[in-house]
């Protein structure tokens, strides 16, 4: 502890009785004074003090109390200061006259010096005596903070007042519990409170330093918090500051819990004794100022803490740790993921144009915007022009895409209704349609640019002269349910779509004629490549679906170099097995019969002829081909039969069979071929007999080429021909099923299917059964028929989406589609007809 500055104080005279009543100095003080004497060889007159003759005697508690009361009354100076006399060292020599003179003039109390860092064990040298007796030093120091206690002591009521104050200041159980859970000040605040004389700490120290007024009163109890804090504070001592050392407030150590109170008493009696000097007023003033400043600061801090703080201020002052940052980052990431998922699931980007009046929608083409209409949950655009009208000079010219801005439109073209079909001949001999017919229909479930859908191009015609499109019309309901886009184009038919003449060949560059309908379909594929994306379609997934005469055109296009990159796969249903094999020159000579009938010498005359005159001049043998049993006259006229399709040298270079020979096996076939088991059925044939019996079937076979070849009995036995269904099955195998299977066998990767599931009273699988099931127009009435529809749709739409046929196996290439799709090694009846040279000789020709 640092040594306080020495200041002069007025001498205080003490009587012998008072000196005798004072308690002898403690053993610790004696030891410290002896060390000082050893250090200073000549004692200073300022520090010496006459010893009491009765210093060595032990005083009683009663005498101590009396002396204390008398001394307290005399020791108060004019200014109210308390002067505490410290007894001198044990000595027996009486004071001399010189000593008294020095005491009167220069007498002052010098504080005892304790070396800094010295060990102070207050309880080690204590005498064993009961606490009730008290210590003589306890009565020497009084409370300096409380003015009320000073006034009471001056009036003689110190004992009574101190007892009441002690009783009042003792906290109750509730207050102690509340203080236990209150926020504890920091170490720095505790240090400042100790320096400035905190009220709680001083009250405890004063209570210990004040002598017991009444021997019968029990010692004051410490609070629960102090009882806990004191052992912990002494077990883990904190570093003392220089102020603690200089003021004498520090403790050297703790000997035991029993000596804790004595340590505090020694601290008060020894360390605070020098406060008697004249600098006490200044020191007390400074301490009070510091105390007031500390109290004001503490009050300001409490007020600052109690002041309501905004959330933003709290967030700014918050110091987050690494764990807090990771938690916040995880929460933000989770919220972000939820937002992204919600955005993807609920948000619809404006990829589709809005509806007008709730049913009209607009799309864009290369020639201008078009407006479609909503139907059955899908959108239909009907009558979109895809090529220039093939009229006047463009009659018998290859189709040309619209590249002239003068042929386009400025406003939105309303494509709500179907356009007129191309001119054609119906089955009853009437003609319908118009030459300006190169339009197409688009049916799409969505008009959007994201998630493009596969495209199915419907090419249907019962014959190359018409009617078209026949049964092959797009279904809005199935477009929506299967997520595909249907495109159905018009294409030229009859003489307008297939006429090949030498005169036409000579004026064309490159020199070619005929197959104009094929160029129409090629133009459609080019239009799809450029525009289908605006209708929600995928130009990289285009499937050609041909039915009957349309299947024949599809088969030719698959083998043409003109369509490479314009389609992805093809499906041909009930097409013709007789494909063009005649050269262009030979076909041109055969078609000169038309010019002779029209009495035209040049092409200009033909272009000026009306469509009605041209249809009237068309030979009947060009329009109709018998779908019946082969007749004997066909054997001699097979080479002279008319064929609409030719080897034009532009679209069709060679016979498809020559192309198939060069093909290699492919896991994903580009063509699927198929037919129905009873596609030769006609109402005209059925009405020949009301009830077809075995005899009637035999008679009908005998009158055909089969009877001429003597195969009637074999055929009846093989087919069990005793009904109309068996007769139709024989005709279908000869004309269509077996010839198509023969073509499929020439292609290593082409699956072939046969529909055998029947309907109606005769259980016939008619020519349109497969296409009706694909487009949703087949009306099932039994469980077997419903399963057939499901199997047929699964075959087709899986192929459209993935490019493979589920039931196709390389060594079992024939798929028998009954109520289920079953792969088989072969279709047995065909081998018989092939062996008899009937197939493919008498195959149907379109």
Swiss-Prot record:
**Phosphothreonine modification sites?**
28, 42, 47, 206, 259, 269
Localization recorded for this chain is:
Membrane
Q: Which InterPro entries match?
A: AB_hydrolase_fold, CarbesteraseB, Carboxylesterase_B_CS, Type-B_Carboxylest/Lipase
Q: How does it sit in the membrane?
A: Single-pass type II membrane protein
| Name of the protein described by the UniProt record | Neurotactin
Lineage: superkingdom: Eukaryota
Tissue specificity comment: Late in embryogenesis, expression is restricted to cells of the peripheral and central nervous system undergoing proliferation and differentiation. Also expressed in larval CNS, mesoderm and imaginal disks.
Q: Where is the composition biased (Low complexity)?
A: 11-20
Q: Which family does it belong to?
A: In the C-terminal section; belongs to the type-B carboxylesterase/lipase family.
Record key words, sorted: Cell adhesion, Disulfide bond, Glycoprotein, Membrane, Phosphoprotein, Signal-anchor, Transmembrane, Transmembrane helix
Q: Where are the transmembrane segments?
A: 325-346
> Which residues lie toward the Cytoplasmic compartment?
1-324
Which cysteine pairs make disulfide bonds?
422-437, 600-605, 738-830
Annotated glycosylation sites: 410, 417, 428, 636, 691, 720
One annotated GO molecular function is: cell adhesion receptor activity
**What biological-process terms (Gene Ontology) are attached?**
axon guidance; axonal fasciculation; axonogenesis; central nervous system development; heterophilic cell-cell adhesion via plasma membrane cell adhesion molecules
- Biased composition, class Basic and acidic residues, residue ranges: 23-42, 63-74, 95-111, 141-155, 163-178, 185-205
What PANTHER family has UniProt attached to this entry?
A: CARBOXYLESTERASE
Region (Disordered) residue ranges read: 1-222
What is the role of the protein in this entry? May mediate or modulate cell adhesion between embryonic cells during development.
All ranges on the Extracellular side of the membrane: 347-846
The Phosphoserine modification is found at 44, 48, 52, 75, 77, 103, 169, 186, 203, 256, 263
Q: What Pfam families does UniProt report for this protein, alphabetically?
A: COesterase
SUPFAM superfamilies, sorted? alpha/beta-Hydrolases (SSF53474)
Underlying gene: Nrt
> Can you list the GO cellular component terms from the UniProt entry?
axon; basolateral plasma membrane; cytoplasm; plasma membrane
